[in-house]
């Protein structure tokens, strides 16, 4: 991220366009997020973007903000200041985002799925990577270690397998549950072998997405 972009973000207060469906930054079909110099401009814009609102104005911390937007799956930040419109392209240099396991593709598809309900974003999840919580029993008399996949039980005692898009989401759940699990990277094909016919919850402590057997089979369906 160059000095021009740093100044653009840090020298003014901005409000961010928020999706009412996710309570997170709104991501459009071109994978842009939007920030505004004035509430007047923001309120005019939301008339053209359904189910959106705006955050309070704040001075953004450029590195943190860009990292966060990268993790959500944004490819550009559109900065609107009156009649002027600037675009900051994401991803930026690795040093700016401190890429860990942000998984922007999966987050992007989930945000767009929640915002639009369009099943193409559901099918896109087939190519994405997730974190699955596991416990590993150390070998004793057995030749191989045993892997146990953590599950959640909701009402009616039904079993749900768990997936997370980021280490932050995984750690939040792991600490809340006191599970002391480890994260295992899986894709939807591997997860289908793990879950058998049970449903899956993605990111249960934030904007959770529940996928039943029908939706999971739709994800894996060949084109």
Language model features with spans:
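An interfacial alpha-helical scaffold signature
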Residues: 1-223
């Amino acid at each position: 991220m160059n000095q021009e972009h740093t100044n653009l973000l840090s020298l003014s207060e901005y409000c961010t366009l928020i999706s009412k469906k996710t309570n997170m930054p709104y991501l459009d079909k071109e994978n842009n997020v939007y920030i505004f110099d004035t509430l007047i401009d923001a309120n005019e814009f939301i008339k053209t973007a359904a189910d959106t609102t705006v955050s309070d104005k704040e001075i953004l911390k450029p590195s943190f903000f860009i990292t966060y937007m990268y993790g959500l799956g944004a490819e550009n930040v559109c900065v609107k200041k009156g009649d002027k419109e600037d675009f900051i392209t994401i991803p930026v240099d690795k040093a700016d985002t401190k890429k860990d396991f942000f998984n922007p593709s999966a987050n992007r598809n989930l945000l767009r799925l929640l915002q639009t309900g369009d099943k193409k974003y559901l099918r896109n999840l087939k190519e994405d990577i997730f974190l699955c919580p596991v416990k590993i029993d150390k070998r004793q008399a057995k030749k191989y270690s045993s892997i146990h996949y953590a599950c959640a039980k909701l009402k009616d005692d039904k079993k749900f397998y768990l997936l997370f898009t980021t280490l932050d989401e995984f750690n939040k759940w792991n600490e809340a549950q006191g599970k002391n699990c480890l994260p295992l990277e899986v894709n939807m094909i591997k997860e289908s072998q793990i879950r058998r016919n049970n449903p899956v919850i993605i990111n249960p402590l934030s904007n959770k997405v529940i996928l039943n057997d029908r939706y999971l089979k739709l994800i894996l369906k060949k084109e």
